[in-house]
UniProtKB/Swiss-Prot annotation:
It catalyses: (2R,3S)-3-isopropylmalate = (2S)-2-isopropylmalate. The keyword Hydrolase does not apply. NCBIfam families: leuC, PRK05478.1, PRK12466.1. Binds 1 [4Fe-4S] cluster per subunit. Its cofactor is [4Fe-4S] cluster. Pathway: Amino-acid biosynthesis; L-leucine biosynthesis; L-leucine from 3-methyl-2-oxobutanoate: step 2/4. GO terms for biological process: L-leucine biosynthetic process. This is 3-isopropylmalate dehydratase large subunit.
Length: 470
């Protein structure tokens, strides 16, 4: 009998029943909720006279619409305020655990879940948010769902799903200095494209992935969706177990021992078969910078803006031309000659303590360049912010000329007060560089925290490896 992949094991453990058409009813272990995709779901429960099936599995937090400055003054934008107030009212009515805006535990939903130990190995985890794939870093099956599905999970604790195919992305060897998890995942997306993972659950493996901390693995799994896959995951190992141990929602005592024994089985069998295998050489990966309006439009910082004339596919060439026009770039421009206007260090991709430490290491003793209008650091949660302040990282950023903000999704998306103006160019540690993502007419370049910090202090994209040597 052929061995099972990690995805197969997680899927099989949660199937309640399988329909004749192959669709399966999956049991959901953890449901994370935020203010944007939940209002209609709660209203649906209310209209049907239903209660949530298991309130103990649900954790709610406002993150998309919350301000990152002057929280004592409340939320000024009326739409944002209504969404946050509606979540507040709904969780109180239905008895759901909630971290409100001014709670130190508040933060981005994909940061606080793992931080609290609400995300555990072997779980099925859903949220009305496409970057739920983040939680797959724990050897969990995690994926985003729509608002109608949010209501369905609240009401039944189950979800109808079609099984995906299996893909293995193995990053073999070890990365060099200055190359991070963000660079690894951008290189993967550059290799397979934004549709490369469509229809698959991606397992990330290889020595370079095993070498990553849990923060790094979360960064990689976070952007599985940018590769087209609804779910990304990493096998459980000692790194996973050590991260989870002692967290608020983690099991304790005998339950911990039995849980760990089960978690150690959460890896793909040696004879498991994948529908597709992609291999990358970790030693060949350099710090990455996106140049266009799709995460697959990415090159090493040492490279140049690609020329559409060299593309063999006319459709791709047309897309490249449009991207260059929107981004205000010329083909063959060296990446290191591109000047920036703003820097954003944050988002569910790169706002954890490891990310802030990496950025601070570059910033320490330097100043934000004169041409940079705004450089901001937005911790992923109140607890990350608290820890960073205990380590003095806030002072490193403030002394350099950065703004030190309150936790939230912030400038990852133009859904709050933090956004780009038309034509402004931003070095961003977020996950999407679509047209208008950070503000109408805004130009987004995706980079790692260290690369964002390097751009902030030089005023243009800079190979952080060279900066480290100086």
């Amino acid at each position: 009998m052929t061995g099972k992949t990690l995805y197969d094991k997680l899927w099989d453990a949660h199937v309640v029943r399988t329909e004749p058409d192959g669709t399966a009813l999956l049991y959901i272990d953890r449901h994370l909720v935020h203010e944007v995709t939940s209002p209609q779901a709660f209203e649906g429960l209310r209209l049907a006279g239903r209660k949530p099936w298991r309130t103990d599995t649900v954790l709610a937090v406002p993150d998309h619409n919350v301000p990152t400055t002057h929280r004592d003054q409340g939320i000024s934008d009326p739409v944002s305020r209504i969404q946050v107030e509606t979540l507040d009212a709904n969780v109180h009515e239905f008895g759901i655990t909630f971290f409100p805006m001014n709670d130190v535990r508040q933060g981005i939903v994909h940061v606080i879940g793992p931080e609290q130990g609400a995300t555990l190995p072997g779980m099925t985890v859903v949220c009305g948010d496409s970057h739920t794939s983040t939680h797959g870093a724990f050897g969990a099956l995690a994926f985003g769902i729509g608002t109608s599905e949010v209501e369905h999970v609240l009401a039944t604790q189950c979800l109808l799903q079609k099984k995906m195919k299996n893909m293995l992305v193995s990053v073999d060897g070890r990365v060099g200095p200055g190359v991070t998890a963000k660079d690894i995942v951008l290189a993967i997306i550059g290799e397979i494209g934004t549709a490369g993972g469509t229809g698959y659950a991606i397992e990330f493996g290889g020595e370079a992935i095993r070498d990553l901390s849990m923060e790094g693995r979360m960064t990689v799994c976070n952007m599985a969706i940018e590769a087209g896959a609804r779910a990304g995951m990493v096998a459980v190992d000692e790194t996973t177990i050590e991260y989870v141990k002692g967290r608020t929602y983690a099991p304790t005592g005998e339950q911990w021992e039995s849980a760990v024994a089960a978690w150690r089985e959460l890896n793909s069998d040696a004879d498991a078969r994948f529908d597709r295998v992609v291999r990358l050489d970790a030693t060949a990966i350099a710090p990455q910078v996106s140049w266009g309006t799709s995460p697959e439009m990415v090159v090493p910082v040492t490279g140049r803006v690609p020329d559409p004339a060299e593309a063999t596919d006319p459709v791709k060439a047309s897309g490249m031309k449009r991207a260059l026009e929107y981004m205000g770039l010329a083909a063959n421009t060296p990446i290191e000659q591109i000047a920036i206007d703003k820097v954003f260090i944050g988002s569910c991709t790169n706002s954890r303590i490891e990310d802030l430490r990496a950025a601070a290491a570059v910033v320490r003793g330097r100043k934000v360049a004169g041409n940079v209008k705004l450089a901001m650091v937005v911790p992923g949660s109140g607890l990350v912010k608290q820890q960073a302040e205990q380590e003095g990282l806030d002072q490193v950023f403030l002394e350099a000329g950065f703004e030190w903000r309150e936790p939230g999704c912030s400038m990852c998306l133009a859904m709050n007060a933090d956004r780009l103006e038309p034509g402004e160019r931003c070095a961003s540690t977020s996950n999407r560089n679509f047209e208008g993502r950070q503000g109408q007419g805004g130009r987004t370049h995706l980079v790692s925290p260290a690369m964002a910090a390097a751009a902030a202090v030089t005023g243009h994209f800079t190979d952080v490896r060279q900066l480290a040597q100086s």
